[in-house]
Each structure stands twice: as structure tokens, then as C-alpha cells.
């Protein structure tokens, strides 16, 4: 059994909301997020698969964590690559649940992570790149693995992508945090 705790902290690390449990924790936080707020998942076990929902509008992310995870609530330009519903309002439902063995071994998209962040965190899969157009969030590498597939435009959600700034040497790295076995790469969408 893993002891899990979810916390919402303000910019000064003061606790706004907190909940804990064994193998599952959920948290209803009645707070309007402010710049600098972050969501923290703490666990007494490392290197585990969990279902993590940092916001009900973002949905469930099946992730592999190697340590405690801090998710910084995005504001301003960092929000335009996300649904306008994400992190809005004053009532938020978050949860984390340790994955069962059958969920870990089932055939699935190993790269999907709607909760990936632009910064390095101990939460995988995680996408990084050597270039992202103008450093804008709508062109961040994480957009390639968030599950949003709208591609008939670009500039703001849902039309976000990995932008290579027309560079021939553009490269993306997808880190799984552990060795994985894959037999397919990608799915084209029109």
C-alpha cells in the first residue's frame, strides 16, 4: 500500500487544501487558483504508476512517477494551449490512484500524458525538445502527447502542436522514466 497525499499550495507554500489516503486519494478544493499556486502529489513509494487528475477538465493521466510531483497551475500565456475550462472556477476535483498490475501491463498508448508540464518533473511520459517556436506554450513539445488532435488551424487551444520554428535540426525527446517496450510509433490524423 502506498500512502498518497494531494495538496494545493499557494506561492508561499502555505497549504490551501489537503487530503490523504492509501492507494487512492481525492480532493475537492474550493478555491479560485491564483498565480503561483501548485498541486503536489506526495507518496511514500517511488517508481509507481498512478492515475493522476490535477483538474477535472484535464482528465485522467496514467503516469509513472519517480518521486513527489509538483504541478504548477498555469496562468497567462501558459494557459492558451489548454482548454479554457481547465483550472477555472472555485471548485476543483483532483485525485490520484495507484494503478493495478493489469492496468500497467495492458496494451495502450504509452506516450499519452494530458498532465505533462513544460518543466522537468519526476512524472512520465514527459516530452522535451531542442526548439519550440518563440517559446510559446501552443508550440511546446508537451502538446504532442496531450491527446488533443485538432489540427486544422494553430495558435490557441485546441489548435496546439509542437512547433519546430522551421529548424532542420529540430528534435523531440520522449522520456518514459523507465525502459518500455513499443511495437508502434504514432498515428496520423487529418
Predicted segments, located by residue:
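Extended extracellular/luminal ectodomain segments enriched in beta-structured repeat modules
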Residues: 167-169, 177-186
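Disordered, acidic Ser/Thr/Pro-rich linker "stalks" and the adjacent N-terminal cap
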Residues: 1-38, 43, 47-175
Amino acid at each position: 500500500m502506498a500512502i498518497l497525499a494531494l495538496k494545493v499550495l499557494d506561492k508561499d507554500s502555505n497549504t490551501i487544501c489537503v487530503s490523504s489516503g492509501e492507494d487512492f486519494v481525492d480532493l475537492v478544493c474550493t478555491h479560485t487558483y491564483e498565480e503561483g499556486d501548485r498541486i503536489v502529489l506526495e507518496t511514500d513509494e517511488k517508481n509507481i504508476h498512478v492515475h493522476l487528475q490535477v483538474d477535472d477538465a484535464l482528465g485522467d493521466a496514467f503516469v509513472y512517477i519517480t518521486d513527489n510531483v509538483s504541478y504548477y497551475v498555469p496562468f497567462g500565456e501558459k494557459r492558451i494551449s489548454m482548454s479554457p475550462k481547465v483550472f477555472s472556477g472555485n471548485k476543483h476535483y483532483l485525485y490520484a490512484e495507484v494503478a493495478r498490475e493489469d492496468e500497467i501491463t495492458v496494451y495502450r498508448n504509452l506516450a499519452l500524458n494530458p498532465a505533462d508540464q513544460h518543466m522537468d518533473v519526476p512524472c512520465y511520459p514527459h516530452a522535451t525538445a531542442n526548439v519550440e517556436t518563440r517559446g510559446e506554450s501552443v508550440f511546446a513539445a508537451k502538446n504532442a502527447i496531450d491527446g488533443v488532435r485538432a489540427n486544422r488551424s494553430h495558435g490557441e487551444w485546441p489548435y496546439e502542436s509542437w512547433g519546430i520554428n522551421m529548424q532542420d535540426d529540430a528534435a523531440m525527446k520522449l522520456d518514459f522514466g523507465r525502459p518500455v517496450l513499443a511495437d508502434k510509433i504514432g498515428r496520423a490524423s487529418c
